């Protein structure tokens, strides 16, 4: 599954190409580039899922957790470090399919829906950034890497909701979404730091559970703060106030944020975070 790295690199490349060189492109060219890249990403995601679920299961009948890529970015101690990589498990593989498929449909639909709109190239650049951020979030190998992509999701959603920046209501809606989710993300970050300090790891795979025993008394606080972050991203009460106003963005963006990807990011993070505590 060495090609899985391209699932992240291709939309990132699309964002850079459209963001930097989009003003010299026609609307048609920008749309074709963005849509074609997402089509390739979707094919790679389906290929990854096919290969993953076709592989032999473990002795207990479960699917293996794989890390095709994992490099240490910032080492702190022998056990505590910030790694960057790709983690594949049944949840992340299925989410790759969901995100790539829905995002591809949004790209295709937007080609006609946004025709003639000012900033067409910028729109497709932001879509590529949002998609890359969501894909990176679901395949993160640890909680801190998840947080990095988590913030990229917030930034890209702010840019998409406020796409019509000459419209005061759209600007207000984007600011509201950004501020509310940043408030929740602050709790998420504090929870991650407590989790890493007392647990001795940022990992959320089951084999790291033994490292948490020394900080068991602080674990509920860390998980509670991380839950606040998930609640904000998933628009749970009382941090739901930003979601209705997100309709100020282009309609395809609203579909992408409301129904498909961003609002499930919080739930997905809570599933991953709960894994080290199942003992």
What are these regions (language model features)?
Residues 275-279:
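Short "domain-exit" segments at the C-terminal end of structured domains
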Residues 1-274:
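...captures the hydrophobic TM-helix bundle architecture rather than a specific catalytic motif
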């Amino acid at each position: 599954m060495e090609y899985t790295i391209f699932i992240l690199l291709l939309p990132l490349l699309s964002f850079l190409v459209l963001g930097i060189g989009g003003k010299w492109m026609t609307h048609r060219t920008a749309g074709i580039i963005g849509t074609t890249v997402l089509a390739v990403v979707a094919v790679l995601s389906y290929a990854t899922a096919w290969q993953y679920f076709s592989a032999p299961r473990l002795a207990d009948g479960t699917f293996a957790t794989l890390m095709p890529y994992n490099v240490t970015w910032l080492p702190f101690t022998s056990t505590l470090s910030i790694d960057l990589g790709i983690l594949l498990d049944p949840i992340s593989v299925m989410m790759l399919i969901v995100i790539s498929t829905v995002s591809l449909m949004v790209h295709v639909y937007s080609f006609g829906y946004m025709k003639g709109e000012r900033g067409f190239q910028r729109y497709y650049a932001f879509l590529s950034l949002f998609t890359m951020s969501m894909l990176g979030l679901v395949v993160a190998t640890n909680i801190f890497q998840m947080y990095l992509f988590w913030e990229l999701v917030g930034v890209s959603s702010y840019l998409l909701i406020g796409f019509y920046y000459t419209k005061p209501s759209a600007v207000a809606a984007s600011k509201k979404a950004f501020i509310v989710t940043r408030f929740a993300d602050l709790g998420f970050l504090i929870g991650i730091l407590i989790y890493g300090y007392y647990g001795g790891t940022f990992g959320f795979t089951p084999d790291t559970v033994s490292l948490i025993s020394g900080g068991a008394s602080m674990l509920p606080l860390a998980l509670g703060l991380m839950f606040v972050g998930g609640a904000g991203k998933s628009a749970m009460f009382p941090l739901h106030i930003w979601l209705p106003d997100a309709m100020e963005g282009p309609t395809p963006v609203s579909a992408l944020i409301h129904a498909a990807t961003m609002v499930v990011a919080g739930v997905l993070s809570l599933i991953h975070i709960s894994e080290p505590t199942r003992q």
